[in-house]
């Protein structure tokens, strides 16, 4: 099975290539914090030899509570992303929530992301696809992995085949998510790169009444399980003070644990991809 290669600058993204990290923080809390977080990611990924793309959101449009922090907004967020790109010479990924945002975001960001909850919204999908940008498609918590073919088809029909699929867990009763490891293989059959969003797979949606809970202590176990499937990349959020983060702190890795965490996953990815394929069908 031929695996498609998506290129972002000098980074090659494919299921049979060394894994790429989409990493950063959940939401832009401030310019200074974003710079601090990106600086540490750059230091660690350069040391470990992991291709890196900075990730953050300028707006969290689906917060549980109307009083929850959402972010600085698109205009201010794009200014921060531009500064990060200039300062650290790294690509940037962020999410798009409405069709009108697609074009201006794609002019600044190297990858635009289709949020899981919005992944079946055809107008949004088409608007994003028509930019020609690389798109990271989050699999909705309510979709089976094989249903991702319909979202891929919408993008392809709009003329865009620069696509990445991303697993972030499936609803399992109330306030819980699970990750079906068999789903990775199903999505890899579409030949597009597949990523694992380990951070949001650890969510307990609505678990704290007015916000999501999480299981940070299990991030290493779940990340190893996912990356053992031979994936194109990992999606990760970290924070210097997760307990006081403005969004999804319970799921975020502590920033000072980033290096030992990624070092283990790098070794695992190298090992898994050194194995020959065994055809068992």
From Swiss-Prot:
Top EC class of this enzyme: transferase
GO CC term, one of those recorded: cytoplasm
GO MF entry, a single one: 3-deoxy-8-phosphooctulonate synthase activity
Subcellular location: Cytoplasm
Keywords of this entry: Cytoplasm, Lipopolysaccharide biosynthesis, Transferase
Family: Belongs to the KdsA family.
Protein name listed in UniProt: 2-dehydro-3-deoxyphosphooctonate aldolase
Source organism of the structure: Pseudomonas putida (strain GB-1)
């Amino acid at each position: 099975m031929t695996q498609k290669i998506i290129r972002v600058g000098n980074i090659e993204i494919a299921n049979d290539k060394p894994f790429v990290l989409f990493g950063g923080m959940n939401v832009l809390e401030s310019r200074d914090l974003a710079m601090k977080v990106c600086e540490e990611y750059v230091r660690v990924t350069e040391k470990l030899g992991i291709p890196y793309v900075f990730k953050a959101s300028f707006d969290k449009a689906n917060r549980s509570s109307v009083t929850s922090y959402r972010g600085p907004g698109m205009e201010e967020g794009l200014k921060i992303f531009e500064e990060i790109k200039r300062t650290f010479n790294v690509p940037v990924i962020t999410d798009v929530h409405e069709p009108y945002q697609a074009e201006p975001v794609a002019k600044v960001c190297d990858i635009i992301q289709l949020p899981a909850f919005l992944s079946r919204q055809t107008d949004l999908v088409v608007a994003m696809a028509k930019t020609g940008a690389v798109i990271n498609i989050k699999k909705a918590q309510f979709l089976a992995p094989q249903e991702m073919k319909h979202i891929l088809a919408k993008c392809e029909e709009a003329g865009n085949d620069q696509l990445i699929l991303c697993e972030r867990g499936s609803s399992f009763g109330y306030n819980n998510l699970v990750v079906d490891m068999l789903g990775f293989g199903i999505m890899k059959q579409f030949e597009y790169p597949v990523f694992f969003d380990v951070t949001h797979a650890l969510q307990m949606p609505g678990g704290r009444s007015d916000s999501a809970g999480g299981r940070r202590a299990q991030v290493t176990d779940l990340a190893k399980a996912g990356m053992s499937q031979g994936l194109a990349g990992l999606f990760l959020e970290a924070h210097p003070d997760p307990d006081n983060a403005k969004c999804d702190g319970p799921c975020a890795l502590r920033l000072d644990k980033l290096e030992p965490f990624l070092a283990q996953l790098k070794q695992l990815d190298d090992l898994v991809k050194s194995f020959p394929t065994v055809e068992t069908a």
